[in-house]
Amino acid sequence: MRLSPHEQERLLLSYAAELARRRRQRGLVLNHPEAVALITDHLLEGARDGRSVAELMVSGREVLTRADVMEGVPEMLHDVQVEATFPDGTKLVTVHDPIA
C-alpha cells in the first residue's frame, strides 16, 4: 500500500485520536497534542459524514471540556484548523476556543 504524504498525515492523526480516546476512556486527562488530534479527527470524520462547516464549528467546541485536558491546555489552544473533504469539495474548518 502506498500512501501520499497527505494520506500519511491523516492516518497518523487518526491513530493519535484513537490513542487519545483510549486514554480518555481510562480516565486520563489529555495533553495538548492528544486534544488537537481528537478535535481534528472529529472535524474530519464529520465532514466525511456530510455535516456542514457551520455544524462542525459548533460541535468542535463540544468534543472536550476543561475537565478532559491537563491544566493549561485550554489556554494554549486558541484555534483548531483543518482542511476537510466535504461532498462538495475541500473546505477549511476553524474552531475558535475549542475547549470551553
From Swiss-Prot:
Belongs to the urease gamma subunit family. One of its GO terms (biological process) is urea catabolic process. The keyword Hydrolase applies. It holds the Pfam family Urease_gamma. It comes from the Bacteria. It comes from Rhodococcus opacus (strain B4). Keywords: Cytoplasm, Hydrolase. Gene3D superfamilies: Urease, gamma-like subunit (3.30.280.10). This is Urease subunit gamma. CDD domains: Urease_gamma. Pathway: Nitrogen metabolism; urea degradation; CO(2) and NH(3) from urea (urease route): step 1/1. Heterotrimer of UreA (gamma), UreB (beta) and UreC (alpha) subunits. Three heterotrimers associate to form the active enzyme. PANTHER family: UREASE. The gene is ureA. InterPro entries: Urease_gamma, Urease_gamma/gamma-beta_su, Urease_gamma_sf, Urease_subunit. One of its GO terms (molecular function) is nickel cation binding. Its EC number is 3.5.1.5. One of its GO terms (cellular component) is cytoplasm. It is found in: Cytoplasm. It catalyses: urea + 2 H2O + H(+) = hydrogencarbonate + 2 NH4(+). HAMAP family: Urease_gamma. Its main location: cytoplasm.
